[in-house]
């Protein structure tokens, strides 16, 4: 009857299966590609204590992600935002540029489609895959290389690769990779942004 849908959603929101399933998905997406039972339990407990309060659930996810030492693969879109922010680059159209033509500023739709992760493209009902193996083809990696190059050339990055590495405490394998990439800053920038560490992969 009237109000039945609200009762159903309230029931499902605090159901144990819901808590367990969504906590595991959140842990896999934000904490680790293979989250531990303790990671999932931490989020589950926050869910129960807060009776499904999303602020508390999200806080628990962030806390666990900060504490985690496990590599977390970055989705193409997440990686792109990370690259732009680390370099303090200007790559997308902002509010003031929406109706202006500037061939150095990319349209969001074109960018996401090229990355293979567009809001507007048909996709599976359960969203994009959280399995990193789905995103690790040579083609998908080559796209990241091209985007890193485009951000360097057109995005006017304000932070050098060496400063970025110092800020994030880059490991020795990443520093060695960047050093071997070449003598020019654009080569170092691409190597850093497409390194295993910044893509959220274990270093070989």
Regions found by a protein language model. Give the residues of each.
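Flexible, low-complexity segments enriched for small/polar residues
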Residues: 15, 19, 23-50, 55-204
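Short, functional "switch" segments adjacent to catalytic/cofactor/reactive centers
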Residues: 1-15
